[in-house]
Amino acid sequence: FNIDYLYGRGYYQNQSTSNFNAGIFASYIGNKYQMQAVYNNFTMKMNENGGIQDDRYITRPEDMAEGKKEYESTTIPVKLEQTSNKNKDFYVYLTHRYRLGFTRETTTVEDAKSPKRAVANDSVPLAKDTIITEEFVPVTSFIHTMKVERARHKFSSAKETEGQYPNAYFNEVASRDSTTAFSVKNVFGIALLEGFNKYAKAGLTAYISHKFSRYELMDTLSRTNFDEQEIFVGGELAKRQGKTLHYNVNGEVGIMDKALGQFRVNADLDLNFRLWKDTVNFYARGYVSNTLPSFYMRHYHSNQYYWDTENMNK
């Protein structure tokens, strides 16, 4: 469990900020079933002042108010009053897997050490104990990951002067902008695990993901909803065990709706070898992608800024 509250007064007028975070975590690790889950909630509020009205309040204070008034940081006039941004976000994340495999016996031979016998005569050979244990060796994993998230943004300004912003689409003297983003993402995968026998030198994973997103934007008479869906298929080839060579190649391609035509491929490699009395490490990383700009790059509605750019899909 985690909880944090931060508050900053700010050095100038209308500059205070507050941040509240809370989260709870849970996990279960067994031989066959494993699960991790987390819930987090974030709330941030920031008062805005738009900056100092005139830099001379700091650079040449004697020129202001004919030099008859001394200004402190909290009394210097600023450009904005009663203006704030507020962001609220929460998400629930769950990942779990069920592993199939086999049980094998391992045999270890240990000295049956007796401190008294060792002290009495250390030349007498010690008896040997044979210990047989069973261990579970996973071969295949069935994986499910889910994330539910909702984020809200609000901007309010109770007093705006003429010409302060280039446009005023809804109200010329005040702003009450807001937007909400909600999404649910599920990933289903199957993995052939590395190292379950001497021939399994790397792990191989295949998966399919589906994400549903709903965005709510303000409009002239009512609010407008935008729904988007993305389906990707992908895979991963990875070698993480051993000392000399490790690599990971992960790629996915979109096959439906907004994901169609998108792809991402990333890879990394590290090679480690001895050189005289030291170890040399060689690292390589690569990344290539073709992705659609984020929703708020394509659509945004507010009192001062408004755009719908569908041609960014091309």
Residue ranges and their predicted role:
Residues Y11-S18, F25-F90, L275-K314:
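Outer-membrane beta-barrel translocator/channel fold
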Residues V78-K314:
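Exposed, low-structure sequence patches enriched in small/polar residues
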Residues N2-L6, F25:
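Predominantly transmembrane beta-strands of Gram-negative outer membrane beta-barrel pores used
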Residues N19-F20, N266:
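Amphipathic alpha-helical segments in well-structured domains
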